[in-house]
Amino acid sequence: MIHRIKYQRLRIELASPEQIRNWAERKLPDGEIVGRVTKPYTLHYKTHKPEKDGLFRERIFGPVRSGVCICGRYKGIASGKETTKFCEHCGVDLTRSRIRRYRMGYIELACPVTHVWYLKRLPSCIANLLDKPLKELESLVHCDLFTARPINEKPTLLKLHGLFKYEDQSWRDVFPRFFSCGGFEIFRDREIATGGDAIKKQLIDLDLQSVMSHAHSEWEELTKQESTGTDWGDRKIQRNKDLLVRRMKLSKYFVQTNIEPEWMVLSLLPVLPPELRPMIELGEGELITSDLNELYRRVIYRNNTLLDFLARSDSTPRGLIICQKRLVQEAVDALIDNGIRGQPMRDNHNRPYKSFSDLLGGKEGRFRENLLGKRVDYSGRSVIVVGPSLPLHRCGLPREMAIELFQAFVIRGLIGRNLAPNLRAAKTMIRGNKPMIWKILQEVIEEHPILLNRAPTLHRLGIQAFQPVLVHGRAIHLHPLVCSGFNADFDGDQMAVHVPLSLEAQVEARLLMLSRRNVLSPATGEPLCIPSQDMLLGLYALTMENRRGIYGNKYSLDSNKETYLKNFSFPKIPYFHGYEDVYKAHQQREIHSHSVLWLRWQTNFRMITSTPREEPIEIQYETSGISYRIYNHYQLEINAQREIISIYICTTVGRVLFNQRIDEAIQGTCQASSRQTMLYIGNKEDRFLSSEKLNRRYK
């Protein structure tokens, strides 16, 4: 077991065979060393007690019942002050049964077996270090290929190099006759190797420092190489450079952590504690078991068969031994990661066995389910719904959830204000939903941020801080613009609520994790708070033109303009002096969101038009020298000195409302920045015309 105060971090790395043996082996008071599992048995079919030397043996893993040995001679737990009691008859430690949760065993394999994670997981660590194709190594591991001279520094008698297939007729005629003679086992193992033994010998022969230096020199040569002029050639060079970089990094990690590469080939296989792979007895003597037990049994069966073949190697055909080595490799692969890049092993009901990797990975794996997915105090969970009326940094917290999360703070407020004499009275008042409870709760949440988290938390924006607002119902109200960081939508997604308790956590939530401080992507720098889906539809409906078109209801610039002007009766378009007049008329229902109007605009403006040098549709003159130039989207009032007195733009009520909201948002965000008012009318090909240019045009 790991002491959580003494050890503050956990590192997962390769274990050496000696370390695996130290995990499992222990010396009993009678001098016997136990820990090795040699039999594929689990429980006796009648008594349901662990079998001897099996996967549940009490002598190896500890007693099933606390303080009770197999023979029943002792039935008491040893005291902590005394030496651990030990049954001399059956050899079981008289300790608590919880020890079966972390006491391990091991299986001594008859042949080296490669670890499937480091061979078949992409990118393959073994293939990267040995600088060989992965398919070639897989064929070698499964005994489809043989390698000659696996250890380079030793002398050889055969002039063999590289790989060859045992299935070739020439090799099948020569090698059985040559290697079947007695006394040639050492010579045979030195000259020719296959399976995990061949991989292990090549890894032992590696010099990591020379591998790093050689890879670095090759990388420098590739960096000096000029472009080939073709995409395929450039991609090939880049792939080779990436491969060399991975090889250098991998070699560096092995050197820094003092891990030997040959540890990626297993000679001892750890056996998990029985409580992590249980067998449970149901009614009427029926047993259900973990899939790991069946996979362990298959490994032991095949390993024991290989041991028998090797013990009778003089009379056992060489091909049968090689085939059995392949079966042992496949059994260990299925135990560690069943079905990786191949067909998985299945039970009698055609269901794939759950391997060690399946128990660790995934949403229901050991890490996410038991270590990362623990229940946390001061947390809750509910469905999210849209809250468009909320500010960006606020969220709607259901009253029922808020009173549970902040109950301790409310109780402290009640007792501190002498509204409740003790804890029990305060809880009674909370259950009674007294009006003062909600007032105190409102005061508490105004000064206390909360954290919202949506699983899976793939980046730091998966957890953001918000200022809560009490809402009715049972759903969390969330502003739609913050959904991009959470990758959330409102089709039934759930989010977790956490209350930061310490002062440091609250300061971090306010200064770093508040949603309005995380509007840009930390990876790309692009904005995250972008309107989408229903927001775009709403903006489109708000700013859309009327059925006749905002640009065509008064004037038309088509080729048949004169005929159009004669036959068309101009509607009366209202004039407004400012935003306030538009708001009042809209509230009094004199105009609607799509009504066209003339709005007085500032003269120090910047405007976008669709025509580079647009000519006025109509010019009106007064006796005082004032003229009115009417364009497609705006009209100008110009005095006798050719100066612009006033400007009216043709727009809609919806666009006025939208522009005002954008203007208020910009002023609230950038109060100190000076800006020029901008009105967006026209299409994408519009250009900017400033008031200075217009004044110069009319002078």
Curated annotation (Swiss-Prot):
Per the annotation, how and in what number is the cofactor bound? Binds 1 Mg(2+) ion per subunit.
**The organism sits in which domain of life?**
Eukaryota
Residues that bind Zn(2+): 69, 71, 87, 90
Enumerate the SMART domains for this protein.
RPOLA_N
Among InterPro entries, the record links this protein to: DNA-dir_RpoC_beta_prime (IPR045867), RNA_pol_asu (IPR000722), RNA_pol_N (IPR006592), RNA_pol_Rpb1_1 (IPR007080), RNA_pol_Rpb1_3 (IPR007066), RNA_pol_Rpb1_3_sf (IPR042102), RNA_pol_Rpb1_clamp_domain (IPR044893), RNApol_RpoC1 (IPR034678)
Query: SUPFAM superfamilies, per this entry?
Result: beta and beta-prime subunits of DNA dependent RNA-polymerase
Keywords of the record, alphabetical order, are:
DNA-directed RNA polymerase, Magnesium, Metal-binding, Nucleotidyltransferase, Plastid, Transcription, Transferase, Zinc
Answer whether the UniProt record assigns the keyword tRNA processing to this protein. Answer: no
Gene3D superfamilies attached to this UniProt entry: 1.10.40.90, 2.40.40.20, RNA polymerase II, clamp domain, RNA polymerase Rpb1, domain 3
Q: What class of enzyme is it?
A: transferase
What Pfam families does this protein's entry cite? RNA_pol_Rpb1_1 (PF04997), RNA_pol_Rpb1_2 (PF00623), RNA_pol_Rpb1_3 (PF04983)
> Can you supply a Gene Ontology BP term from the record?
DNA-templated transcription
The protein's required cofactor(s) are namely: Mg(2+); Zn(2+)
- Which EC number(s) does the record attach to this protein? 2.7.7.6
* UniProt catalytic activity: RNA(n) + a ribonucleoside 5'-triphosphate = RNA(n+1) + diphosphate
GO molecular function terms attached to this record: DNA binding; DNA-directed RNA polymerase activity; magnesium ion binding; zinc ion binding
Which Gene Ontology cellular component terms are annotated? DNA-directed RNA polymerase complex; mitochondrion; plastid
Positions of Mg(2+) binding:
489, 491, 493
Q: Which PANTHER family match?
A: DNA-DIRECTED RNA POLYMERASE, DNA-DIRECTED RNA POLYMERASE SUBUNIT BETA
Q: Which HAMAP family match?
A: RNApol_bact_RpoC1
Query: So what does this one do?
Result: DNA-dependent RNA polymerase catalyzes the transcription of DNA into RNA using the four ribonucleoside triphosphates as substrates.
**Family the UniProt entry places it in:** Belongs to the RNA polymerase beta' chain family. RpoC1 subfamily.
Q: What is this protein called?
A: DNA-directed RNA polymerase subunit beta'
Origin species: Aneura mirabilis (Parasitic liverwort)
The lineage is: Eukaryota, Viridiplantae, Streptophyta, Embryophyta, Marchantiophyta
Q: Gene for this protein?
A: rpoC1
